[in-house]
């Protein structure tokens, strides 16, 4: 709220009264000045701001505010001075620099300061239009001297912004001022192709003036005629554009003047017309535009005039529109516009569209209006009246174009709606999708009986936009579709129409059109609607400015909710009803299944939104929102009396959607519940369609009765419609088709019923119908119940009967081939025997051929149909599921009429031709694949002409096969004699004298007999009684063309079984153009190799059979739905369809969503088959020893790595290790160590066999091989399933790729992996484990030593962090990288530096020395970020950088600061820094890490007993070793799933990373760096167990632990351990162990080394650690496989846990899980290390012992928490 001057003065006085200090009063002057500025008291504002500047002279905001006040007073000099001072105080004010430059150029361009500030602003705003204008002003003041510079400036600006109107006009003006008119005309001609310029009034005015000046100049007179014609062409086009823009934006007087100027240009061009050139075509088109604009101007004059005679104006306007509409379209192309569209063609479409619609609008409701206009005004009098109404000048009419044009030849031609719809599409392209134009067109169609083609309009504008979305519930801009935009346009047109009707008052003349012509009508849509439409167009065409993209998306997203009636949409119910009715009507009129489904589906969506509102309307009215997208109109509010009718319409739409989806029964039930003519009509369509579908086949009596019932129901419903229409005429309006169409359909149904009553569909008047007159077809449609009520039933030219198309194609094919057959048939007639009875055909005698596959039709004779091609196998009408008319269009070259003698003629129809064939038809010369395993005879190798190609792939059924003798039907069987002599093709008998049995039946059989055999075989068995003749007839057939020898067809699918086959359309993604391209149409098969079990996917194109997909199916493949379709799946695979392996992204599109879902299920089932793992539930849990062995191997690896660390740190430790090895007590235990528990143990055990891994294997992305695990043999030493780094001949598993890139799937018939069990391999007692060999797919290159430059430096600090660099140009911190930041110290010169590399890429992002003058400072607002300045060399060159590093934790940040300060001190003292590594490892350095170890340990379960005799199990050790006694007992334990032979693999299982070592730590005596060296020794005849943990940090139970007080390393290595760190009693042992807390702190271990020795040891230790890290990196691939197998083990654990038979061990397993979870989630360190012996011991104890262990662990944890606290 703006304050007045009095309000501000009172407020200022009150504030000053409370402020005693003068300085404080002055400090408030800025605020007071702003208040006075708001009150527009600029003098008082200057007064207070000046008092503020006196005390705060360096405030840039105050100087800027003062400059603004001076600028308002137009005191430019003082304003510039204030702005300049503000910029000096704050140079970041870029906009103020531009402001100073603009003020100086505005004040005095010649001022030298202006040039300086313009150049300064140009550096800050490169490419800014404001800068260009300032530079242009500076160059203009230089006159002719600056023209060259100005020309260069304009050219450079045009290159950046070619659509800028001002720059183009400026260039043309520069050409004109320099007398370079030809260049100006050339630029105008070139720029006319730019749509942005064509829509500018200023640009078109400039072009018209330039072209007129050029035509009048001397240059034009000297030029040739073609140049003059081209210039005239451009001038006429410019006049047309200018006239259109002027009508929209200027007043009537300017429109008149411009139209008169346009008239003069047409008159001058008229005199020089000749021939069919560009100027003539343009002149004719511009004539039409001239009259169209004249008619629009007349109506505009009526809109703005007073006391207007609308009748006179409308009649003259109708005359103009008639002339414009009857101007023919141009026949030549003028030039190409945007997107290659012809410019004249688009202008002609726009003219015809506007003129046609205005003619219909003016003549609406007036009979013979156009005829009267032509009779009255199509003469000289009317022409004179038109001239007087348009032009006000007194020039003679004869010299003008309008006065001299001949208008007496026009006809009364009313536009056709079909033509208008076609013209509208071109007009939309001309207007580039303007919402105003689309709304105007919609309003014109709103008054016409036909529906507007909005769908076609939008498809012209948005080619690639999907028609419908499956995500109606979302409002994401990416989900927008054509239907959303169509609904939006419907809403805009609907509300605009209602608004126009409200404006038409009672004085509205009948001659005044409801909607004015497009150029003169006001804006028809709201600003909100226009902004949303523009935002959608910008996003779809990807023309958004980067900074404006988010705003556009938000705008589109907000209105999508309204369009889809989501949430609080605020739509008027009447509008929702309008949308639903329009969509239902449009969808019903479509022939496309998907069109119907999408339109009717969206209609149902809106009806569901309307129905709840209708219930509310019964009680209350719907509230109107404040600012809706579509305005509410109370004139169309739904009344309570209309609610029932709308609810009925909604339920009819629901039923129609059911019918479209194929739910016919539901649709029939719904329609029958609604008593209305619309439901009766739909029911009639449904039942008639059912009858048609049955009629297509040869009908049985039951089918005839069913068809008759359907036709009867159809007749009854049609009669109901006619009766209701006769009784109530208002009912007819609801009917979706004319009543005449209903009567026509009824007559057709009655005729069909009469046919049934006369003998069925195959009989008429007691005789057989002609085959060629009764062939019926069914045009395939995605839905067989296409409800099209908007069209007449059968006689509409747009939708002919479904069978006519196929019948016409069949008849055309017959006509083409009759001539080819006639010659041969004449020869056959001449050679035929007169004694033989002829086969009587309906017209002529043709040789018998076969029919194309899939052809169906009514046939005169069973087995002898009228046919077209000879390659199809079927003789019955058996339509294929994927019916394709291409089967009927085989090339004529396939037709080979067989020349035969008179002996080959068939019997007459009286005797019949009754071959007992199956519905699958005949097959010539080849059997079905299903019969290949049967014994077959070799086809006869003679000159027979009956061997055809293999077309078995087209039909699944089996049929009669000619050319085989074993179990097939042959012509030899047909004419078999009584003596039993057979018949062979091509065999000549010299004694043959003709048929002796002429006149008898050749073929007689019984269909029932063959029907019984059809279930087991597709071939006919021989029947001697059925095919015997009286004499032995040796029939000889002479082939017309000698057939080549039969070649066995090899497809590569011989040894494979078809698991799945379905017709699909395949697509391939082209990465170059980023589009899906169709690859072929055919059957997609999934084949299984019967030998090796491999599965592959194969697809061949139809007819040509070219392979378009051929690849293996692996478990790593993943089906993903294709966006925008629920019938398509896409996947990636190495495809071999082109011969070589190529990674392709493929997509298969199915006919229905059900088929797509079936394919997905089959695909996943095949992936599960690849796993080949049987699902078995163990009935008894038996411990086979695998879990125990797995834990043993893991612990061996850990202890080996720890001992290796200890070995690296101390020479004394090395001595101890050597002694241990010498006495056979190696702590790192070799990998041969096994656990040998008591053989007599009968406790409960676990079984780890019979894995069911199918569920998890599908998620496995590593291996596609199948794994089969089976129970192991009960041998003491078992063979392991997996083994690294060794090869064994008995290997059953290999990580070799299942797909070799050098061979295609069709060539690889051998399995790449073999699956077996442990029992399949014979092992001996000496073979401890099977060595599994893993052959790499791609060999690795030789290992190259990587030199990082950090070799001679120790890592003092290392932790993951994020580093930033300060960018001075933008004044912001910018992220430089994320990685490990290290502080390194050189061993030689003690220099310290900071090094940081980015993750993965390892690029340096920090590299500089730490100098004494450097200091770390906290960044404001956070304590975890340190900031410093250094000379950094990260980019190779020295550069001063402001750096900042951010850590995740506060203690890490503090540690970094501490080490940083120590580094500065250490450099001064020339000493080494004590290393501190703040974390153990990074993900990159530790591929496996502790999580993998924890998961591995979590997945293990075992139970063993304590070793007997003197061997005591050391519960605290990390490595278990067995007794070496000669007595060997069988261990019922499970071998581990993984056994690693390589030492480097073992080392990954260490629980800690190798750390830099600190001498003089506080570990207990006998420990070094946290590791115990008090290795307990056994007796002389037993081995020792090394203790890998002791000291203060390794106590299991402080209260019960007893340690040696004064022991050292030498004593511990020679003495026998008496007190163990942790031990538990067993059932067989009564030994009690006590645990006591040490009485005093153990003494520190001191090592007296020299400085050089310490440095040398640290170097060697660091190098060893680096070498260890290298080994860890080498086995990264192995770890990945390990982790995947661990996942499989986890899934098995979960399965076993769900087993009800594990009740006894469930509690123990639950506790073990809890301990393991504690181990996983504890931080690395002593707390985690202390759990290891607990876990190991627990896994070996009985349930009772584990319960005791639980109490021990609980006490330990409580003590640990108290000590840490």
From Swiss-Prot:
CDD domains: RanBD2_RanBP2-like, RanBD3_RanBP2-like. TPR repeats lie at residues 26-59, 60-93, 648-681. Residues 1235-1244, 1580-1593 have a biased composition (Polar residues). Keywords: Cytoplasm, Phosphoprotein, Repeat, TPR repeat. Residues 778-797 have a biased composition (Low complexity). Residues 1702-1752 form the GRIP domain. Residues 1036-1172, 1333-1469 form the RanBD1 domain. Coiled coil: none annotated. Residues 760-804, 924-945, 1214-1247, 1306-1330, 1580-1621 are annotated as: Disordered. It is found in: Cytoplasm. Residues 931-941, 1594-1617 have a biased composition (Basic and acidic residues). The modification Phosphoserine is found at residue 21. PROSITE patterns: GRIP (PS50913), RANBD1 (PS50196), TPR (PS50005), TPR_REGION (PS50293). Gene3D superfamilies: GRIP domain, Pleckstrin-homology domain (PH domain)/Phosphotyrosine-binding domain (PTB), Tetratricopeptide repeat domain. Residues 1317-1329 have a biased composition (Acidic residues). One of its GO terms (biological process) is NLS-bearing protein import into nucleus. InterPro entries: GCC2_Rab_bind, GRIP_dom, PH-like_dom_sf, Ran_bind_dom, RanBP1-like, TPR-like_helical_dom_sf, TPR_rpt. The modification Phosphothreonine is found at residue 19. This is RANBP2-like and GRIP domain-containing protein 5/6.
